[in-house]
Amino acid sequence: MIQSTMGHKQSVDSRGKGRKVPGSSSMVQKHRVESSGGAIISGPSLFDNLPEDCISNIISFTSPRDACVAASVSKTFESAVNSDSVWDKFLPSDYSSLVPPSRVFSSKKELYFAICDNPVLVEDGGKSFWLEKENGKKCFMLSPKKSMWITWVSTPQYWRWISIPEARFEEVPELLNVCWFEVRGGMNTKELSPGTRYSAYIVFKTKNGCPNLGDVPVEATVGLVGQESSQRHIYFVGPSDQRRDRETRDVTRPTKRKDGWMEAELGQFFNESGCDVVDTSILEIKTPYWKRGLIIQGIEFRPTKSLFYI
C-alpha cells in the first residue's frame, strides 16, 4: 500500500496503475506494510483474533528460526513466541538433566539461547553439550581425557596434558613424539537428536607446522557399530609441496573455526532412532617418522549442514 499525494491510500499493480486489491475485506485481509514517515506498520491479520495460547501451539510445531521470524509479524505473535510453551518444545526432553540447577533463567527462551551460546560440561566433564541455534539439534564434543582413547597418551615422553584457557576442558593432550598415531572416540547415539544426519570433526591446534604429521594424509573413519563405516583421509595442516597437493586433491583440508581452533571433518552418519553407538578413529602408522606438534581439544558431533536451502 502506498500513501498518495491526495491523502488517499491506493494499491499499485506491476505496471504502476492503481487498482483495488482482490480479497481485501477485513475477514481475509493479510498483513501489509505501509509507508508512514519511515515507520513499518503491520496491518491486522485474521491470526490476531486467535487466542495467544493457540498461536503459541501452532508456532511450537515450527523451528526456533521460524519462531524468531514470526515474532516480527505483530505484537500478538511476539508475545506468543516468547511464551515458555513454545521454547519448551524446542528444548530437548532431557535438558533438565544436562543443565546444572545452579544456572537460573527467567524464561525457557533465555535458557534455550544460553545453551546455544554457552556449551555446558556434562558427565563430570566427559562431554561438552550445546544446541544448534537454528533448529535445536543436540551437539556434543568428547573430552580427550575422559571420553576418548589415544595411543601412548599416558606415557609422558610421547604426550603431555596441558591446560589452556581457550579449551572447553580442564586439560587437553599435546603430542610430543610418536611414530604410531591413533585416536579414537565414540558415544551412544541416544544422546543425539534422532532422525538427524551428523558430521564428526576432530578439533585441534598445531605447533610449528605439526612436523611429520601436518602434511601427511591421515586415515579417518566414522560409523555406527555393526555397520559399514565411511572412510576418508584428512590433513591437519596441508601438503608441503605442489606435487603432493596434486596427488591428494580428495583429502579433506582443515578449516579455521570462529573460536580460533581448527577442525577437519572425519565423516558422516545418520542417527535414525538413537539405538546405536557411533565410533570414530584417526590413524597414521604408515610413515616411520616421529610426529609432534598437535593439540587435541576433542571430537565433535553436530548436525550436517545442508548444501541446499529451500
Swiss-Prot record:
Residues 44-90 form the F-box domain. Residues 1-34 are annotated as: Disordered. The lineage of its organism: Eukaryota, Viridiplantae, Streptophyta, Embryophyta, Tracheophyta. Signal peptide: none annotated. Gene3D superfamilies: 1.20.1280.50. PANTHER family: F-BOX DOMAIN-CONTAINING PROTEIN, F-BOX PROTEIN PP2-B2-RELATED. This is Putative F-box protein PP2-B2. It comes from the Eukaryota. GO terms for molecular function: carbohydrate binding.
